């Protein structure tokens, strides 16, 4: 009987515990850095600033390669992360080639990659 009561108490305390934070402080910094680079890429595309486009595209790829980027070890998250890095590298290649139309297309794919990953993480948390 004591075990049952103890189990109920432990389960109740676990249920009352605050949920795990949505992201670590390091991941939050990387996401804000990613957002800043993405905003500057949009600026570069809309102003035809090839140098800014190339610089920010490379910087964005570097953010996605940082160790703090892959904090979750789930296969689906890894797939989203690899897709983001691939598209970011494609964007950097279009920037090097000074192809604004292709860069704009890659930027759209990059945005969808972000959206799909954030949607996955949100749905995963809601399912808990």
How should each PLM-predicted stretch be described?
Residues 17-19:
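N-terminal signal peptide c-region/cleavage motif recognized by signal peptidases
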Residues 7-15:
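Bacterial N-terminal signal peptides
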Residues 1-4:
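Positively charged n-region of N-terminal signal peptides that target proteins for export
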Residues 6-7, 36:
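General helical structural elements
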Residues 23-128:
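Sequence context surrounding c-type heme c attachment/ligation sites in exported
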